[in-house]
């Protein structure tokens, strides 16, 4: 089966067990994920993209031998349908930042919520 279609299982972020098992930094995420027998990890940027590209590249290097594939969850405050132009433009930047981190992680997927239509009509 092609790696593009390989079924993967992983977590979305780390749980309390990450620290309880003695892990301290995101560079240890690949080891933590592999130890659980998983082969995917969704890096959470729900409150902002705070992972540097250099660190993301190191995480990718550590995950490759373990066959762990990353995805990225973009910030929750994205609102592509906001009536305010600055919010829409900022949302585009958040998506681009998420894409850059995903690429550095060697990931292929970005998860995001586009926002509701708010006060606009759906028509």
Task: Describe these PLM feature segments.
Residues 81-123:
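Active-site acidic/histidine proton-transfer and metal-coordination neighborhood
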Residues 1-97:
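N-terminal pre-domain/capping segments
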């Amino acid at each position: 089966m092609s790696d593009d279609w390989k079924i993967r299982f992983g977590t979305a972020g780390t749980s309390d067990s990450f620290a309880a098992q003695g892990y301290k930094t995101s560079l240890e995420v690949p080891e933590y994920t592999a130890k659980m027998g998983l082969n995917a990890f969704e890096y959470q940027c729900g409150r902002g993209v705070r992972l540097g590209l250099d660190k993301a590249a190191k995480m990718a290097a550590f995950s490759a031998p373990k066959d762990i594939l990353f995805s990225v969850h973009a910030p929750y405050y994205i609102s592509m349908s906001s009536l305010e132009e600055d919010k829409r433009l900022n949302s585009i930047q958040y998506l681009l930042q998420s894409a850059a981190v995903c690429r550095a992680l060697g990931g292929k997927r970005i998860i995001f919520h586009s926002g509701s239509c708010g006060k606009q009509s759906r028509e």
